[in-house]
Amino acid sequence: MENILKERLLSEEINEGDISINKPLLFQEFIDSPFSKSKVEWEHFHHLSRMLFSCLVDADRLDTERFMDVESWRKRGNLATLVDLFPQLEAYMQKLQSNAADTKVNRIRQQVKEQCSRTSSSEKGFYSLTVPTGGGKTLSSLLWAMKHAVSHSMNRIIIAIPYTSIIVQTAGLLKEIFGEENVLEHHSNFDPNDIKDEENREKAKLATENWDYPIIVTTNVQLFESMFSNKTSDCRKLHNMANSILVLDEVQMLPTGFLQPIVDALKAYQEMFGISVLFTTASQPVLSGLIEGTNPKADFKGIEHIKEIIPEEFALHDQLRRVKLAIDDTGRTYDEIAAKVSEYNKVLCIVNTRKDAKELYDRLPNDGVKLHLSRMMCPAHLHETIGKIKTLLKDGVAADCQGHCNPTCGGWCGYRLSGCVPSRSRTRFCIASSGTVQSGRTKCHGTYICVQSGCREAKPLRFNG
């Protein structure tokens, strides 16, 4: 994400010495206008300008569409409100709870949901939801956002996620709850032609232009690029962010090089346009207060107050600790690791690079079904393979699986795959990513998927080549 933003936002650098603006004279008319009551700061003025520009662009495009393409124009609108959709979420939650087994993990998840429900009517502002992997963060954050929106008559929920793998998973859950006609996916891997209903397909295509949908799931790049863009196509959607809830999932993945302008933008949107922001992750970054750098320009001016939804006494990290990391200081060769993996019928092996994954994959025996996962695969192939893995794990069918992703981006963090080590079938599933990140997901649904050898101690491995 950081590289993409650098390429797009820093393509034309502007030196401070090149700018000659008399701020008092330039904004004297604005200061004397009714807008002065909003106390817009100089640093935030460009967000107000861009928001007004968004209103103008969308109104102009819609009027033109009504004149030039009335059939498309008629397909817009007639959308459900969040108030209309809330009963569907309640029904889904109730059904989920009634069918859930009485386990420790499920009791903790219910506790988290109840806490989110209790705090949802709080005033608009910045909130954080810190829940370890497996604690039901996705549904709990959705419940909080929905009830918060209903309490404050807010327009829509926008969920921004760093990785398309998680977006596909989250959007699938949301469509299951609310129906595909109420959930908009907006990212590079989404193909509107996958929507079977023609009316819903056409509405989704049109909605990507201005985000006129009750629930939007998009990427961080799409969101923040639009907030700082000067292009009509990017800015057109911005006015529909006003009076909305912005859920930033896996917030620790925000690029540090752009953290200050991102935080400044969020503060501006909260103050001027009435949004609420929910930061969700298992490991919250420090986004509040003032962090002094080596010089004044390096100071980080964070958000003044972020309210954590889950109190410390819940001790969720202790209660949900499911994996004990035992660092193996002894280097292993690919052949040794492959031989160890081959001893078990169903194994998840996490390695660190694509090269490691390929070397290990080539050394695994062919006495089963081999499956390969990579972030280099095209989206259709990737989703097909993930679906096959889930089916094999669910049905207990023999499989010999290997998957890998970009080790530097952690593209599989937050992705849900459930299985267990002991099995009568031969299933070996290897994934290349951060061992520490992925080990947190190895018992997300009450089943063990271990990193090295099928034991209950995950051991990130070092290869000697």
Regions found by a protein language model. Give the residues of each.
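Accessory nucleic-acid engagement/destabilization modules that flank
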Residues: M1-A91
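Conserved helicase motor
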Residues: E185-N200, N352-D356, K370-K390, H404-G410
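Conserved Walker A/P-loop ATP-binding site and its immediately adjacent core
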Residues: M154-F178, H187-F190, V286, R354
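Interdomain hinge/linker at the junction between the two RecA-like core domains of SF2 helicases
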Residues: S283-E343
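Inter-Walker segment of RecA-like/P-loop motor cores
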Residues: G179-F228
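Conserved segment of the helicase C-terminal RecA-like domain
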Residues: M1, A399, C430-G465
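Walker A/P-loop
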Residues: E123-A145
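Conserved strand-helix element at the start of the C-terminal RecA-like helicase core
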Residues: R156-I167, K340-P365, K370-S374
